[in-house]
Structure formats: C-alpha cells, structure tokens
Curated annotation (Swiss-Prot):
Record field: compositional bias (Low complexity): 153-169
Bias-annotated ranges (Basic residues): 142-152
Biased composition (Polar residues): 203-215
Composition bias type Basic and acidic residues, residue spans: 175-189, 234-247, 326-348
Residue runs in coiled coils: none
Physiological role: Multifunctional regulator of the expression of viral genes that mediates nuclear export of viral intronless mRNAs. This immediate early (EI) protein promotes the nuclear export of viral intronless mRNAs.
The protein's name: mRNA export factor
Entry's family note: Belongs to the HHV-1 ICP27 protein family.
C-alpha cells in the first residue's frame, strides 16, 4: 500500500512539474515546488515528499546542464543507471569476465529494479530532452545558472526536517565543472560502476554546435571518368591513370601538396605536341627534350663523312690540293677535286674476297662473323708510317721555329738529327753519327744553347728519347750508353755545369732499365763472377769510378753515382760536373764509342766461361742478331 501511494504521488508530481514548465516563460524564475494542495497534503508522507523532491531536483539539473556529478547517490541507483547506459559509458573493473551467454544472461535476469524507480520513468527524461531539441518544447536559457545543489531546507516544503542520506552524512554542495576541465583524482569513489553526468546518451548530452562539429563532412563528389583517353581539361596525373588503366591495373599517381597548389595545365591532344623541338612523344609533353641531337651526328651524316669524323681533333692536317674543300685552291694547284665517292674509294679500298674465303668452306663457316667485325676486310691504303713520320716532323718544326731561326730545315736537323725528310735543303748530310771531336763539340754546344733557351724543344726531345730507349734494339741501346758518357765527357772538357733535366741526363734511369731487361740473368751472373760491388743489394755508399772492371760496369757505376747525387736535389736545374766525377776519372777510362764496341765482347767472353745454358743461349741470341728465332706462328688472313 505504501509503495502504491508513493508511485501515485510521484506520477502526480511529475505531471504538475511538466505543466508548470510549459506555463513558465523562458526568462522567468522556475518555481522549485508546485503549491501544495490539501488533497496532496493528506496523502503525502515524509518518504513520498523526499522522493518527489529528488525527482524535481534531477529534472532541474537536467535542464540546467552539466553541473557536476551528484555526491551522494545510492549505490543501487548507480548500478541500475549504469545498465541503462551504453557499454561505452559503463566502466568495468580492471579484469572483467569475458561476455558470454553463460555469465551475462543469468546476472541480468536476477537483478530487480529498485522500488520507486522503473525503466519507463528513467527513459522518459531522454525522450523529453530529444523533443526539446527537435523544437517541440521551448528551449531553456543556457546562461541561467541558479540554485546550487544543497540539502538545506527548501522554501515552501511541508517538511522542515531533512531525512538522513544513505551514507549517513550531510550532503556536500556540488561544484559546476567548466567545459574542457578534466576530472581529478579527488572525486570520491562511488561503488563498482562510476556513471558520468549528465545521465543521457552521448549523442543527447552534446549541444547542437558540438554535434555539428563531431559529424563527418559529407563525401566530396567525384568527377566521373572521361571516356576519351586524352582531354584538355584533365591533369597530367589523370592522363597517367588512364595510361595505367589500359594495362589492366589502376595505379593512382601520388600528388604532393606542391602539385595540388598548381593550376591544372592544358595538355595537347595526341598528334599536337609539335613545336621548335619537333614532334615529341606524349610522355614528354610536360617538358622540353633534355637534349637536341644536331644534324651533324645523325647516321646519314656519319656514313657520308666517316673518314673526316674519325680523324683526331688535335691533329692539324694539311690537306692536299685534290682533297681541298675550296675549289679555288684545287684550281690554282692544277688538280681537279674528285667527287666524294671517288675520294672514299681511294682512301679505303674494299678488295675482293680472299682466296681462303672462296675455297675453304670450313674456314668461311668458322670465320663467318669475324670477317665482318671492326670494319670487315676493307683496309686503308694510305701509308700509315709515312703519314705519322710527316706529322712528327711537323711537330718538330713547330717547336724549333722561332725568331732566331734562319733556316728551318737546318735548325730542325741540328736539334733532331734523325728527323731528315725527303725535302731537306741542307748543304750536306746531317746525322747523329760524327767522326771527329771538334764536330761533336760544335753539335753539343748548339744543343746546350737550344735546350737552355727553348723549354718546348727540351720537352719534345725528352719525350721522344724516352720512347726511343723503350723500343730500340740492343745495339741502339749500347749507342745510347755511349751518347750519355760522351755528353758527360763534353761537360768536363768545356767545364760546363750539368743540367739534370735535359733530354740525355733525365733518361738515364730508362737506359739502365732497358739494359737490365735485355741482359736479364746474364747481368747478375757477370757481376757475381767479376766480384763487382754492384752485385751487393744492401750497399748504401757511393762507388768510385775506379772500381769499374769493364765498360759495362763503368757505365753502371756512373749511372749509380749520378742517381745518388740527383736523388737529394730533385729540383736543382744546374749542378757542377765535379759532384759526379770529382777527380775526372771518366776521361782517363772512357773513349767515345767504347760501349758499342766493347760490351758485346764482354758478353761473348762471359758466354764462353759460364756453364749455365741460360747465359749461353741469351748471349748467343743478343750477339747473333737472330731476333726472328722467337717467332713461331704468323698468319695473316687479310692478305
């Protein structure tokens, strides 16, 4: 009976509160309690009034907004309210049991709603809130913040006494939380579940602006794909997508922020990509070609001017009258300039097939591809040796010619005696070989003056002498040894200072290396047999020229002394001749031409006394001048 009266009172109180809410204007104060009636006073008791006050207070707090969680709500009511909330707002314990049918359904069935609180009444508040947001009910003023929650005696209440709370203590005033504040650890613990405030679903608790901000923006309308492969209103990335679609797989291009800011560029249609660079492929429409190949390097130009393009660019050729490009020059010289085809046939002849190619089928099948490699069987008919000899003579003329040169041919023949051309206008034959000491002194003085005053002549002479010593024969190598000792002897005779960087002294090392290479094991065996100090590899002191036992050891001792003196002074340009030969022993032991005449005799004597087959064989090969003994195969199929 008591429960029935409580429910009836709660229903009447809720109806009266709703009527008062509809009747109250938006900016006026809302009365906390309706005026008491005599019928209601007779039926209400202390417990029913307490329940009604709690109901009205919750309704007011729902209308006023988020004022903070209540501090003394019953634990049973919290558990029931947590059931009504979605799973997102129910905070379980640290290790909740896994949800399954075995442990969740019996627990829900065993729970009973609390007395005076039904699920229908709890669900009415969200529905009324929803109707107010839709516009059915007048919206309250959000700026009104009145009536802090407290349990002090209310004005107009029929009961002046306050019933004790479930916790046994007095109510504490709730403090309103501002938007954006975080919950601190000072919030009191409230049982197994802690339900947030206000007690509505998350989509109902938010204000209309917050709901609008949380919603996802509608998807942007996509442009339908174009049916044509290339259109002027599409970007280069769209064209790339269309090209990938044809392969059966859509590959979208990665568009960066910088590309997104660029305005769309109009792309020409297929076949319209022409301009000053010529026709281009669709892939290169966006940028000019990286390199424009000139007409000079086309295949047709190369086939037509093959011989001209194959010439080294550093060679300054003097064209003959028949090959001159200027017809006037050809006419003045009395020769007729032949056409290009005849000139090509004269320069490069294509002979008929060799006899082995016509008769030997096995060889023709075996060399089917090799006969066409690197230009095939066509060979140049020009005399390569004559052409390069003329080129070397032209380079010598260039370095020799100066203001003091009266006769170019004579000056060239004096500086480079072996460079004697067929058009020489010299009075007499000029060569490197001389039979008198006075003639040698005149030639040596001329070379000394030229090498000291013209560095270009010195540079060219040094280079050609180094190549000569590397490729000369054994007899020429012995003559080079005589040339070095004679040059030293002339400096002693004229009391001239030595120049370590002249063409003769600067190539002493190359001369010694040539001797060691050609003599090989014979040199080591001869030095050991004659007990020469040169055979000691650990020697650190200089050897005197008096220690020489033969012309070969004399030259090697002189080269050793000269190298040791110049090793400590690499940048010295002039050195006294007494540093190398202080006592002048060389002029007492050496006569010009001794090396070329006496060293072969020394090798022959060593071959007679040595028992090693290697020494006898090597000496016989060098002295017998049978340089063709080492050739075993010589086949020339181009003939």
């Amino acid at each position: 009976m008591q429960a029935e009266q409580t429910r009836c009172a709660a229903a009447r109180g809720s109806a009266e509160m709703e009527s008062l809410w509809h009747a109250a204007p938006g900016d006026e104060e809302i009365p906390l309690h309706p005026p008491p009636t005599p019928g209601a006073m007779s039926l209400e008791s202390d417990s029913s009034l307490d329940t009604l006050a709690e109901k009205i207070e919750c309704d007011l707090m729902d209308l006023l907004g988020d004022m903070g969680p209540p501090c003394d709500i019953d634990e049973e009511e919290d558990q029931l309210f947590a059931e009504a909330l979605p799973p997102l707002y129910s905070q379980p314990t640290e290790n909740p049991p896994p949800p399954n049918a075995a442990n969740s359904i019996p627990e829900q069935a065993g729970k009973q709603p609390a007395e005076g609180k039904t699920n229908t009444e709890r669900n009415e508040r969200p529905m009324r809130r929803k109707r107010r947001e839709d516009g059915d009910v007048g919206q309250p003023n959000p700026r009104r913040r009145t009536h802090a929650r407290s349990r002090s005696p209310r004005a107009g209440s029929t009961s002046s006494q306050q019933p004790p709370s479930s916790s046994g203590g007095a109510r504490k005033p709730c403090v309103r939380r501002e938007a954006g504040d975080r919950e601190t650890s000072e919030k009191p613990a409230r049982g197994k579940y802690c339900a947030p405030f206000p007690r509505q679903a998350p989509h109902q608790c938010q204000s209309p602006p917050a709901q609008t901000a949380s919603q996802k923006p509608p998807p942007r309308p996509q442009r339908p794909p174009s049916t044509t492969a290339y259109s002027p209103d599409r970007t280069p990335h769209d064209h790339q997508e269309r090209r990938h679609e044809g392969a059966g797989k859509m590959i979208r291009s990665v568009v960066t922020k910088q590309d997104a800011r660029k305005p769309p560029r109009r792309v020409p249609h297929r076949g319209c990509g022409t301009g000053r660079h010529g026709r281009r492929t669709p892939e290169k429409w966006g940028a000019p070609p990286s390199m424009v190949v000139p007409l000079k390097f086309t295949r047709e130009y190369w086939e037509k001017h093959r011989n001209e393009l194959k010439k080294p660019v550093w060679r300054d050729y003097s064209r003959s009258a028949c090959t001159a490009r200027d017809p006037a020059r050809a006419h003045d010289s009395g020769a007729e300039c032949p056409p290009t085809e005849k000139r090509d046939e004269r320069r490069t002849c294509a002979p008929s097939q060799p006899r082995w190619l016509r008769e030997d089928r096995n060889a023709a099948r075996f060399f089917d591809k090799a006969k066409d490699a690197f230009g095939g069987l066509a060979l140049p008919t020009d005399d390569m040796c004559t052409r390069n000899r003329d080129l070397l003579r032209a380079m010598a003329d260039e370095v020799v010619d100066d203001d003091d040169c009266e006769d170019l041919d004579l000056t060239r023949q004096m500086c480079f005696p072996t460079m004697i051309g067929p058009q020489s206008r010299a009075a007499g034959p000029v060569g490197a070989r001389m039979d008198s000491w006075s003639e040698l002194c005149r030639r040596a003085a001329f070379l000394k003056a030229r090498w000291s005053s013209q560095p270009s002549v010195t540079r060219v002479a040094r280079a050609v002498r180094s190549l000569y010593l590397t490729n000369c024969s054994f007899d020429e190598l012995l003559e080079a040894c005589d040339e070095t000792l004679t040059w030293m002897l002339w400096h002693q005779f004229e009391d001239e200072r030595l120049c370590p960087h002249d063409p003769i002294f600067s190539n002493i090392y190359a001369l010694v290396q040539g001797l060691v290479t050609r003599l090989g094991a014979v040199l080591h065996c001869h030095l050991a047999a004659s007990k020469s100090p040169l055979a000691d590899p650990t020697r650190t002191s200089e050897l005197p020229l008096q220690s020489a036992t033969c012309p070969l050891t004399l030259f090697l001792t002189f080269a050793d002394r000269f190298a040791r003196v110049m090793h400590g002074h690499p940048h010295v340009t002039l050195v006294g001749h007494k540093i190398v030969d202080h006592e002048g022993v060389l002029r007492t032991l050496y006569l010009p031409g001794m090396c070329a005449r006496k060293i072969p005799v020394v090798l022959d004597q060593h071959a007679n006394v040595c028992r090693k087959e290697e020494c006898r064989l090597l000496c016989a090969q060098l002295l017998g001048k049978q340089y063709t003994v080492g050739k075993f195969l010589c086949c020339d199929l181009y003939a």
